[in-house]
UniProtKB/Swiss-Prot annotation:
GO terms for molecular function: rRNA binding; structural constituent of ribosome; tRNA binding. CDD domains: Ribosomal_L16_L10e. This is Large ribosomal subunit protein uL16. Keywords: Ribonucleoprotein, Ribosomal protein, RNA-binding, rRNA-binding, tRNA-binding. The gene is rplP.
Length: 137
């Protein structure tokens, strides 16, 4: 699963996702993409589940790019532990995704295959998404 090799600090604040995505809103690598429509934190497990669903449907043809990376440590305290005594330990890693952000890109496959692969991948994610494609020039 995806996670940073090392970080400057072990724990971070929750933070909020305001407005639309500042960068990563255009297709840079592939011809087809999956774009987020609403803000959410997406975990490394969800990214991996979506990637597996996409690559499994593509059957080793084409190429997949993951455009988001889980760099936010999410902490939690053990069950049945009283409040206080400091912040919990890091439980998992997540990526903040703002509306308009491209999460996955595909290339080297027909449009109908890409559309279905990204639909299956989107089913593994907790947000509404939209299929986009590069405009033929």
């Amino acid at each position: 699963m995806l996670q940073p090799k090392r970080t400057r600090f072990r724990k971070q604040f929750k933070g909020r996702i305001h407005g639309v995505s500042k960068g990563g809103t255009d297709l840079n690598f592939g011809a087809y993409g999956l774009k987020a429509v609403e803000p959410e934190r997406i975990t490394a497990r969800q990214i991996e589940a979506a990637r597996r669903a996409i690559t499994r449907y593509m059957k080793r043809s084409g190429r997949v790019w993951i455009r988001i990376f889980p760099d936010l440590p999410v902490t939690s305290k053990p069950t049945e532990v009283r409040m206080g005594k400091g912040k919990g330990s890091v439980d998992y890693w997540a990526a903040r995704v703002a509306p308009g952000r491209i999460m996955f890109e595909l290339d080297g496959i027909p449009e109908d295959v890409a559309r279905e692969a990204l639909r299956l991948g989107a089913a593994k994610l907790p947000i509404k998404t939209r299929f986009i494609q590069r405009i033929a020039e």
